[in-house]
């Protein structure tokens, strides 16, 4: 399942791998994040606890600061469905867009979050998780 919003934000799911992929590119607006939050809620509603999220922000230039509440909604939807881990790809730490701070409020200590600078490292981490 794949849904793309304005070519800036996309949400995909691979149920067989128990994986949700959230990608953002370019300049992302509040409206795009709001639409993505709704799509995340739809995609994860039938997921069993223990799935993984890959958040790919390699091509993100900027995100409206007013989108923070909708980022929180995405995190709450994932936490509510008992996501096991969130693996992020953020090549430039200056483009973190406050995800680490938001995570502290929306994810409990039982949700593992880890950030990588490269997609290759993130995929390696996901591969190691699936081997466990």
Predicted regions and their residues:
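Amphipathic, Lys/Arg-enriched alpha-helical "gate/interface" segment within cytosolic domains
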Residues: 1-132
């Amino acid at each position: 399942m794949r849904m793309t919003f304005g070519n800036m934000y996309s949400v995909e799911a691979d149920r067989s791998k128990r994986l949700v992929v959230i990608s953002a590119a370019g300049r992302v607006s509040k409206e795009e994040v709001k639409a993505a939050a709704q799509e995340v809620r739809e995609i994860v509603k039938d997921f069993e606890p223990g799935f993984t999220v890959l958040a790919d922000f390699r091509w993100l230039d900027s995100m409206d600061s007013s989108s923070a509440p909708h980022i929180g909604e995405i995190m709450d939807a994932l936490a509510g469905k008992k996501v096991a881990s969130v693996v992020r790809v953020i090549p430039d730490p200056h483009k973190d867009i406050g995800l680490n701070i938001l995570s502290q409020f929306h994810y409990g200590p039982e949700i593992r979050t880890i950030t990588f600078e490269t997609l290759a490292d993130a995929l390696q981490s996901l591969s190691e998780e699936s081997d466990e």
